[in-house]
Every structure is written in C-alpha cells, then in structure tokens.
Amino acid sequence: MKILLSPLFAIITTLTLTWLTLLNPTLLQSIDLRISDQLIVKEKEFVEDVVLVDISEKTLEVHGQYPLPRDIYGDLILRLRQANAGVIVFNLSFPEEDRTGQDEGFTLMLPNGVILSHFPSNKAQNRSAYSTAIVQVGGDALDYIYNYPGIAANLEKYENAATGIGIANTLPEIDGVVRRLPMIAGVQDKLYPSIVLEIFKAYT
C-alpha cells in the first residue's frame, strides 16, 4: 500500500501512461472501451417478434446470381404480410432497374409497411435520395455529424412508393467494434433519418 501511495510510483505511472499515449494515441481509449464493454455485459435477451431473412448460398443456387430478380423480393413481401409482419425492412438498396423487368410489380408491393435502405458514400454522386422531412431546433445538426458527399440511393419510383427510407450506416469505434448507430446522417448538406428511426416511425 505504501508503494502505491508513494510519489515515485505516481511519477512512474504517469510517465508510463504518457509514453504509451505517445506510442499509440488510441491505446488508452481502446482499453477504456474494453473496460466499458465488460461493465455493461448482460445476459442476452431473445426477441421473438423480430425475424431476419437472409439471402443464402442455397437461394443463389436456385435463383441465380445476385442481385435477385425483383419478383422474388415482391413474393417475399407478400409472404411476410400473410404472416402478419408489422414492418418489412430491406437492408439493401435498389439503385438500378431490374434486369428481368420486374420493377413495376415490385413497386406495387412497397406501400403499407415496407422500409428501404440507402447507403451513404464517400464518392460524390449527382442524384440525391428521397429526403424525409426533419425539423431542426437549436442550430444546424450538420455542424455535429459527418456530411457524406454521396449516397447509393434507390430508384426514385421505389422511394416514392415505399413507406420509408432510412440511412443504413455504421460508425465503428477506434477498435473496429460498432457500439452505436447514428439516428441521423448528413448527405450533400441534407439530413437523412437512420433506418432505425424509420422503423420506429412506421411501427408506432
């Protein structure tokens, strides 16, 4: 105990931490994040009313290469509705016309509970995505969030038909782990809601 309270120990500890910070500026922050992870770890809760539908290797073997024809997605929407799905979310974007000519049928399936995603990009693009109205109070939110120069938007007819469209992006911490999801994102000086926020709006 005397050693821990001695001035020499304090000086050595301070110099060591300073040296480690200079050697690797993100090291202490990474350690702090790992400690926080251990403090908030709790038993996993299983949610039965959320279902994930994945595009598997077997699906690609049956229906061909990705992207799948839009009528397959339309049939999936129909089956999910028959199973009383409240909100249907696509964690992928549809920026191009369907190669099999199924755009019209897919568009008709998008109203009433279908949420599409679009993905921000660091590559500048000419076309802007559909923008959901966001009311700002107390300053410009773009001063505090990352403003992407481009976005991988869906076809305009899809975005006009869908119940909602949200940004699907993640911001990993310095150790590469995703712990938080932004509720809004800036793209080409406009604000876009996250996919999580759009799901919440549609569900409530």
Where are these regions (language model features)?
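Non-transmembrane functional regions of envelope-associated proteins
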Residues: 2-204
